[in-house]
């Protein structure tokens, strides 16, 4: 159970917002969800937890390729950012006021796996066709060359596409029904490709240049659009494709989205790509980060030193910041502490709340501070951009 530490007039971490204009009202709505081939009853919840989130259709429908992202990406950091970042980017095309969210219903597990595979040629293709008469040679990753050593083959033809994610956005058709209004497709691309020459051998790495990754991502995106347009339900809806650069397995921060494109309803033409200038940065800063973001580096250093001075029983302060166009937009700080009693947790949290407001009072930055011990989460401090006062919770 949580005990709320009131600072000014704080409420819950996620405040219940008013209902949106597209799906307004203070009552649950029972509506009909229509597709090209069927219709079924659905419920629109009466509350939305935040303007930053979409309402979701009930009953909840799991994605047709559910779980594949977890299996295909390198770290939990990338898994989370790939999904939540795709929803964040969707808001540029599909307003949270006018659209409902639904996990992908048009790309099933078998389809996605076949697309993530390598293209087969020569004897590999003949073998696959012999083993499965219904085999479809749909791999979006390059085939391995027919000659050369295993190392030479993998170095020259790495796997570029690591994972694919579909999100569907539903829009009101009329007073009593909704229909598919748009689709987001995320393509997760490898910045580092890992392979083994033989089972049990040490893992080898192939670093992929940013320019190559972008070129291959755009090429794959065009083929994905061509294939999606052949599906009845996806012929005449806008589709946005976003390219995600997956971090290496050893990275302590997630990767980032690098570009996106919007394809108009009924079209297969990708006319242009919009660059996405965002990245995650770890604090305390290394030399490169300190040189690029000297002011932010100094703020974090002073924040950390202040904690060291007044509370020695902690084991470190680390932060992960999201930068958009080289400006900090979010800062998540994790502080593990040695637990000596609840009164110390309260005192530490009170002190930290003041420090957060002193050092991170810029209205454009979302700040979250998590205080933990060996027993788990002890407290959380949240100050969203524009808030005059933070929200604080101490856990019982």
Swiss-Prot record:
Keywords: Cell membrane, Lipoprotein, Membrane, Palmitate, Signal. Residues 126-155 are annotated as: Disordered. CDD domains: CamS_repeat_1 (cd13441), CamS_repeat_2 (cd13440). The keyword Iron-sulfur does not apply. Residues 1-18 form the signal peptide. InterPro entries: CamS. It comes from the Bacteria. The keyword Translocase does not apply. Residues 126-136 have a biased composition (Basic and acidic residues). It is found in: Cell membrane; Membrane raft. One of its GO terms (cellular component) is membrane raft. Pfam families: CamS. It is a lipid-anchor. A lipid is attached at residue 19 (S-diacylglycerol cysteine). A lipid is attached at residue 19 (N-palmitoyl cysteine). This is Uncharacterized lipoprotein YerH.
């Amino acid at each position: 159970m949580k005990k709320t530490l009131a600072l000014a007039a704080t409420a819950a971490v996620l405040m219940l917002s008013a209902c949106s204009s597209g799906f307004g009202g203070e009552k649950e709505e029972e509506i009909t969800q229509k597709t090209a081939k069927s219709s079924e009853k659905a419920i629109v919840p009466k509350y939305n937890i935040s303007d930053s989130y979409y309402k979701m259709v009930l009953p909840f429908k799991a994605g047709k390729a559910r779980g594949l992202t977890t299996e295909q990406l390198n770290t939990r950091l990338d898994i989370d950012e790939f999904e939540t970042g795709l929803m964040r980017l969707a808001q540029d095309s599909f307003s949270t006021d006018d659209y409902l969210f639904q996990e992908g219903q048009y790309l099933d597990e078998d389809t996605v796996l076949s697309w993530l595979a390598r293209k087969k040629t020569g004897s590999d293709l003949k073998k696959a066709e012999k083993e499965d008469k219904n085999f479809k040679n749909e791999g979006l990753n390059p085939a391995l060359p027919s000659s050369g050593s295993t190392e030479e083959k993998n170095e020259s033809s790495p796997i570029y596409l690591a994972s694919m994610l579909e999100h569907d956005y539903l829009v009101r058709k009329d007073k009593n029904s909704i229909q598919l209004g748009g689709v987001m497709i995320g393509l997760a691309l490898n910045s580092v490709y890992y392979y083994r020459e033989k089972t049990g051998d040490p893992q080898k790495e192939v670093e992929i240049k940013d320019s190559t990754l972008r070129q291959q991502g755009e090429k794959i995106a065009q083929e994905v659009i061509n294939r999606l347009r052949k599906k009845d339900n996806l012929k005449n809806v806008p589709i946005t494709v976003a390219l995600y650069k997956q971090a290496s397995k050893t990275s302590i921060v997630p990767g980032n989205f690098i570009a996106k494109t919007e394809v108009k309803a009924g079209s297969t033409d990708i006319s242009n790509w919009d660059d996405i200038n965002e990245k995650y940065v770890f604090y305390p800063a290394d030399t490169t980060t300190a040189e690029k973001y000297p002011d932010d580096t100094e703020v974090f250093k002073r924040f950390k030193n202040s904690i060291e001075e007044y509370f020695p029983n902690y084991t470190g302060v680390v932060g992960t910041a999201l930068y958009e166009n080289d400006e900090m937009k979010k800062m998540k700080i994790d502080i593990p502490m040695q637990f000596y009693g609840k009164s110390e947790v309260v005192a530490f949290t009170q002190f930290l709340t003041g420090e957060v407001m002193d050092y991170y009072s810029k209205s454009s930055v979302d700040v979250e501070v998590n205080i933990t011990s060996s027993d788990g989460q002890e407290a959380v401090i949240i100050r969203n951009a524009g808030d005059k006062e933070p929200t604080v919770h101490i856990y019982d």
